[in-house]
């Protein structure tokens, strides 16, 4: 797994990358080592006189002494930063550094200056000056100063002094973080130096000290540049701790780093907006352009990404402790109650936040703890997952956000998610008749399922144009001539249609184009075309043997997730266009999965289910009948359908022209999520600034909230004959216009969804890993590397 960009962007901050005081800025005295040494000794002699003066603090000239020492120290450290090793001894210290080490210059000056802290006047100002001088020396030195004990001791004394109660100021905090950041960069270049900064316990039984680390922790959740520098420096130390058991144990056992990170996430989450200002009807998730301008959310995301990076590079002890603290200190006490707020707006916000968090983190250990929280944690006797599943059937906005969350969960390709949502209900095979259990592994090699899905396209949505010439590859047979394209096999079996195994069906060439390509290609040709006459709709209602009032037993139910998806799918005519895009995309995502149980449940049109269990084919047949009934009740349905197609095509072309940058930047590695072309629904659900010409084209056709724009009851100038609405109040007219608009868009989306299911069923026939002989043992690799969710 590639390292995150936290480490790479620190390269420009290592010593030597600053613009040096080059020859053009260098005075002649700096170019002469002997002269530099003479000047250096002269400054030191002036300082020594002041240091050795008795009672200087009480003298009237005490302030003058402080100023003189400060000025002389600045000159000496400037010369020391320019010092180089002599050519005869390139590995040894330079002449100025050798003299400073011999005289213990840094510690003596610092000790004298720290004595003035007792008086309490100007302490923060002096401390900021000291930090700035040492930062300049460390960052601009041309020699490895930290290899020498006297230099490290002086730095540790200064860092220890920074822990004393001193009035804080922005300059003091900035100087401290900048010095610590430079020290961490130097230590990262020479990891062996890290343990020199780990001080032994001051007394028996006490914990050791790593001031380089402990002084950075209070700044980890600061906003702005200061917090970013602190997190960058801490991340360097985390990476070093992976190779140092001593430092790793110190961070895990003797520091408050992990509790601070977890409790900081909780505090930052409490400051997030409880209500999200929705930018448009198609909004369903938080993208970077949505949250980057919200300071509270941007700060939280920065801290969450930092936690993800720490778990990625830190010592295993630190990783485990941080994951546990995030689960027990943030997810359970904070996210759990937030997801169960009574206000719908708060539920929408918390669900959108959770989806954003899952989409942003990439480290498997952190993803595992989020999934463990969702799948196993119970809030008021119900798991978080059950609560989220139930919300799919709620109002439009909460439904869209919930569907977006489950789309992200399925994109993780985690077997535990699929098991909890679907497979644990399908594994007993109680949803199928006993005689059908051996057929679960069957693969549709002859395109019968694809033909069945295409036969469900409503007659009112078909373009009755002459059939194109029949290509040679259209007939799929194992031998012998193919049948006439207009012939269809009789449907056998009430409730669960089947096709004679000897039949040969005319189907397109197997392919898996994106939803956008399918939609644009079919609509540009004038609608969906069938290779033969439209087949008669098979009987797709429930089996006559099932009583109307009988509820399916728990053993027969396909699970609450599939039940709520099917219920929402059956009400496609009442859903908004954006809900239908998310809904059909989620069902198609499930259908793409190669697991035989799931594939047979969704795509095997010959499977005979229990009388009380609805199949996807039955649900789609119900939607087809509703669309045809609606089309028969609207005299101008063809004109409305044409307008809706034009709008969706224009919107699709608009978002496709904007390119993939309109969507969120993927953070997950290729091993977890495979890249693919965006679907039509994804493109239409994006928020992006549009080119002027395309924006104007879409605005002409865009449906309004009042039903205008497509001739769906609004009477816009460019619309066709308006729909005759019932007389009554404005709310009734708007409600009827919305109903008509949703139904017309459903009539556009539904055929494309059927074509996609047909393409997916064909793709399974040529890509399924279960095409081996039934006598052979099938070995399927695990879906993901998350491992078990149980702790």
UniProtKB/Swiss-Prot annotation:
It comes from Rattus norvegicus (Rat). This is FHF complex subunit HOOK-interacting protein 1B. The gene is Fhip1b. It comes from the Eukaryota. Component of the FTS/Hook/FHIP complex (FHF complex), composed of AKTIP/FTS, FHIP1B, and one or more members of the Hook family of proteins HOOK1, HOOK2, and HOOK3. The FHF complex associates with the homotypic vesicular sorting complex (the HOPS complex). Component of the FTS/Hook/FHIP complex (FHF complex). The FHF complex may function to promote vesicle trafficking and/or fusion via the homotypic vesicular protein sorting complex (the HOPS complex). FHF complex promotes the distribution of AP-4 complex to the perinuclear area of the cell. The keyword Protein transport applies. One of its GO terms (biological process) is endosome to lysosome transport. Residues 496-510, 541-552 have a biased composition (Low complexity).
């Amino acid at each position: 797994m590639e390292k995150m960009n936290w480490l790479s962007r620190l390269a420009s901050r290592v010593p030597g990358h600053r613009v040096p005081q080059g020859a053009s800025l260098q005075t002649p005295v700096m170019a002469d080592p002997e002269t530099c040494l003479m000047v250096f000794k002269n400054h030191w002699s002036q300082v020594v006189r002041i240091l050795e003066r008795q009672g200087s603090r009480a003298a009237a000239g005490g302030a003058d002494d402080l100023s003189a020492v400060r000025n002389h120290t600045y000159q000496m450290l400037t010369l020391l930063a320019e010092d180089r090793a002599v050519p005869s001894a390139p590995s040894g210290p330079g002449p100025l550094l050798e003299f400073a080490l011999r005289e213990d210059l840094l510690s003596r000056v610092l000790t004298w200056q720290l004595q003035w802290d007792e008086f309490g006047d100007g302490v923060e100002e002096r401390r900021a000056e000291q930090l700035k001088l040492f930062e300049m020396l460390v960052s601009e030195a041309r020699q490895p100063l930290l290899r020498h004990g006297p230099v490290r001791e002086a730095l540790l004394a200064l860092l220890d002094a920074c822990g004393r109660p001193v009035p804080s100021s922005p300059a003091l905090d900035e100087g401290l973080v900048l010095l610590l950041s430079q020290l961490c960069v130097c230590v990262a270049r020479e990891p062996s130096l890290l343990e020199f900064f780990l001080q032994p316990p001051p007394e028996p039984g006490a914990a050791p000290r790593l001031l380089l680390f402990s002084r950075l922790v209070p700044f980890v959740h600061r906003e702005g540049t200061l917090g970013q520098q602190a997190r960058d420096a801490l991340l360097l130390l985390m990476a070093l701790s992976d190779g140092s058991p001593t430092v790793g144990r110190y961070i895990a056992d003797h520091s408050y780093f992990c509790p601070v990170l977890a409790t900081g996430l909780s505090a930052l989450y409490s400051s997030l907006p409880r209500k999200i200002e929705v930018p448009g009807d198609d909004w369903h998730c938080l993208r970077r352009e949505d949250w980057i301008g919200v300071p509270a959310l941007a700060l939280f995301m920065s801290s969450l990404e930092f936690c993800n990076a720490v778990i990625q590079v830190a010592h295993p002890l630190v990783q485990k402790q941080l994951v546990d603290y995030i689960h027990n200190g943030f997810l359970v006490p904070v996210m759990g109650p937030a997801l169960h707020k009574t206000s719908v707006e708060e539920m929408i916000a918390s669900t959108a936040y959770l989806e954003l968090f899952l989409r942003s983190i990439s480290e498997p250990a952190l993803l595992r703890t989020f999934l463990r929280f969702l799948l196993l944690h119970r809030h008021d006797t119900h798991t978080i997952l059950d609560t989220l599943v139930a919300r799919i059937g709620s109002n439009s906005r909460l439904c869209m956000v919930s569907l977006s969350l489950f789309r992200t969960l399925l994109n993780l390709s985690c077997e535990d998610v699929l098991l909890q949502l679907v497979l644990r209900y399908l594994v007993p095979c109680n949803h199928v008749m006993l005689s059908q259990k051996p057929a679960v592994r069957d693969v549709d090699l002859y395109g019968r399922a694809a033909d069945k899905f295409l036969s469900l396209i409503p007659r009112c949505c078909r373009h009755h144009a002459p059939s194109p010439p029949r290509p040679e590859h259209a007939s799929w047979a194992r031998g012998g001539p193919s049948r006439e394209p207009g012939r269809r096999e009789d449907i056998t079996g009430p409730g669960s249609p089947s096709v004679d195994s000897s039949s040969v069906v005319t189907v397109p060439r197997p392919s898996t184009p994106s939803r956008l390509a399918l939609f644009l290609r079919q609509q540009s040709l004038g609608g969906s075309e069938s290779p033969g006459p439209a087949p008669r709709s098979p009987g797709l209602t429930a089996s006559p043997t099932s009583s109307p009032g009988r509820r399916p037993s728990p053993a027969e139910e396909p699970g609450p997730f599939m039940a709520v998806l099917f219920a929402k799918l059956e009400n496609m005519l009442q859903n908004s266009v954006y809900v239908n895009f998310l809904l059909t995309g989620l069902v198609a995502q499930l259908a793409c999965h190669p697991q035989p149980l799931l594939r047979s449940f969704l795509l095997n049109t010959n499977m005979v289910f229990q009388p009380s269990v609805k199949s996807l084919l039955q649900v789609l047949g119900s939607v087809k009948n509703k669309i045809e009934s609606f089309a028969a009740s609207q005299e101008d349905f063809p004109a409305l359908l044409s307008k809706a197609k034009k709008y969706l095509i224009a919107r699709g072309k608009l978002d496709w022209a904007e390119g993939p940058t309109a969507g969120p930047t993927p953070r997950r590695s290729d091993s977890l999520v495979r890249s693919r072309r965006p679907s039509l629904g994804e493109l239409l659900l994006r928020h992006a600034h549009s080119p002027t010409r395309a924006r104007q084209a879409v605005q002409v056709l865009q449906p309004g909230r009042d039903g205008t724009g497509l001739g769906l009851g609004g009477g816009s100038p460019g619309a066709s004959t308006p729909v005759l609405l019932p007389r009554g109040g404005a709310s009734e007219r708007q409600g009827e216009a919305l109903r008509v608009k949703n139904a017309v868009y459903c009539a556009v989306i539904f055929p494309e969804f059927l074509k996609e299911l047909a393409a997916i069923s064909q793709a399974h026939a040529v890509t399924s890993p279960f095409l081996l002989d039934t006598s052979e043992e099938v070995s399927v690799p695990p879906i993901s590397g998350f491992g078990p969710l149980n702790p």
